[in-house]
């Protein structure tokens, strides 16, 4: 680990780290890794964890700091065997914390992308602030979410999609998650979920609820040589929105390019945020069934848009992918996948497969 190479005189302490953060100073190399290791091993106290989580968010973390946090978390995670599924899979996940209580757009988009033939390795959790997170909704649909590493890999290999339930794969994170729940406000830990997929997929459509931190996340993905679209709806959503424009940080070949994206340019009607609002797990599961069953409207539009975004990100693994043609192809594929019934069939197959395990 980075912190293991610190000189003896530089050995971090909580007062030195919290002192730097609370005076707005960036941490030195290895200090964020040391702090995260203390948290993941259960050495840090709840007060130290809370102080670190809030102070880091207020200071505004750098990509280097967040990379250290994510790398330590992955070091402690249960690994999904990528010799079975490779790493050219795609994740579709957001930070949460946008407060909008929308239906589970990324979950629906993930099913559509998998049905379009691109392997999906989704990482997710129960709701932190909304009524129903991706895990809650999948459970209501009948997908087993408590699978271990080999079972998740088998699901990707057999069905084309797998779900890594964060609690199952990051057992050492329990020390931080209890504090996070008690705090009830966004912290630096909100950024870590999308950055710590235990299968380390190389492609992703990653939503960030905070525009000022989206670029930080993009920097982490750039250092991993990923092909990722980090997206922030200009209405505050941690998804590609259909109510207005979105800002996209396009990560490809180690570079980050910031773009403004207007779905109207591809023929999408402006939606009202109220049309995208969800409810509890049963309500959101019913929305999934309706959209995959062909129901038209604002939710379907948002699902098609986000599924296309993930297809564009995956296409970006090939260096010759062109932006507008990739979007046109992605939107056509996402639409066809729903209209042909392929997405609906894939969900049914996924439920059957996981229930047999």
Swiss-Prot record:
EC number(s) given by UniProt: 2.4.2.18
Coiled-coil segments: none
Amino-acid positions noted as binding Mg(2+) 2 in the UniProt annotation, renumbered to this chain: 238-239
Binding site for anthranilate 1: 94, 125
One Gene Ontology term, aspect cellular component: cytosol
GO molecular function terms attached to this record: anthranilate phosphoribosyltransferase activity; magnesium ion binding
Binding of anthranilate 2, residues: 180
Catalyzed reactions per annotation: N-(5-phospho-beta-D-ribosyl)anthranilate + diphosphate = 5-phospho-alpha-D-ribose 1-diphosphate + anthranilate
Pathway: Amino-acid biosynthesis; L-tryptophan biosynthesis; L-tryptophan from chorismate: step 2/5
Residues that, per the record, bind Mg(2+) 1: 106, 239
InterPro entries listed in its UniProt record: Anthranilate_Pribosyl_Tfrase, Glycosyl_Trfase_fam3, Glycosyl_Trfase_fam3_N_dom, Glycosyl_Trfase_fam3_N_dom_sf, Nuc_phospho_transferase
Cofactor annotation comment: Binds 2 magnesium ions per monomer.
Source superkingdom: Bacteria
SUPFAM superfamilies: Nucleoside phosphorylase/phosphoribosyltransferase catalytic domain, Nucleoside phosphorylase/phosphoribosyltransferase N-terminal domain
Function of the molecule: Catalyzes the transfer of the phosphoribosyl group of 5-phosphorylribose-1-pyrophosphate (PRPP) to anthranilate to yield N-(5'-phosphoribosyl)-anthranilate (PRA).
Annotated PANTHER family: ANTHRANILATE PHOSPHORIBOSYLTRANSFERASE (PTHR43285:SF2)
Family statement drawn from the similarity comment of this UniProt entry: Belongs to the anthranilate phosphoribosyltransferase family.
Annotated NCBIfam families: trpD
Protein's UniProt name: Anthranilate phosphoribosyltransferase
Organism per entry: Mycobacterium sp. (strain JLS)
């Amino acid at each position: 680990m980075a912190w293991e190479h610190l000189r003896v005189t530089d050995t971090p302490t909580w007062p030195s780290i919290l002192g730097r953060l609370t005076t707005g100073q960036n941490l030195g190399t290895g200090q964020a890794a040391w702090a995260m290791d203390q948290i993941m091993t259960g050495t840090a106290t709840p007060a130290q964890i809370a102080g670190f989580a809030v102070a880091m968010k207020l200071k505004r973390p750098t990509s280097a700091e967040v990379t250290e946090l994510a790398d330590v978390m992955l070091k402690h995670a249960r690994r999904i065997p990528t010799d079975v599924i490779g790493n050219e899979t795609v994740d579709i996940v957001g930070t949460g914390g946008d407060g909008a209580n929308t239906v589970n757009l990324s979950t629906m988009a993930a099913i559509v992308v998998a049905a379009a033939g691109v392997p999906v390795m989704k990482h997710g959790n129960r709701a932190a602030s909304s009524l129903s997170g991706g895990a809650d909704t999948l459970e209501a649909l009948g997908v087993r979410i408590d699978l271990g590493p080999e079972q998740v890999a088998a699901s990707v290999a057999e069905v084309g999609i797998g779900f890594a339930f964060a609690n199952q794969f990051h057992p050492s994170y329990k020390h931080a998650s209890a504090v996070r729940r008690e705090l009830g406000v966004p912290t630096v830990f909100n950024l870590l979920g999308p950055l710590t997929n235990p299968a380390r997929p190389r492609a992703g459509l990653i939503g960030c609820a905070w525009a000022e931190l989206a670029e930080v996340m993009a920097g982490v993905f750039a250092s991993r040589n990923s092909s990722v679209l980090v997206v922030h709806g200009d209405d505050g959503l941690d998804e590609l929105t259909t109510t207005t424009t979105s800002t996209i940080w396009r990560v490809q070949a180690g570079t980050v390019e910031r773009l403004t994206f207007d779905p109207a340019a591809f023929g999408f009607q402006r939606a009202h945020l109220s049309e995208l609002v969800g409810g509890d797990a049963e309500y959101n599961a019913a929305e999934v069934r309706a959209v995959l069953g062909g129901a038209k409207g604002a939710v379907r539009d948002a699902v098609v848009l986000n599924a296309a975004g993930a297809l564009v990100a995956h296409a970006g693994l090939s260096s010759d992918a062109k932006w507008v043609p990739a979007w046109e192809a992605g939107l056509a594929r996402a639409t066809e996948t729903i209209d042909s019934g392929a997405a609906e069939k894939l969900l049914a197959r996924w439920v059957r497969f996981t229930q047999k395990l």
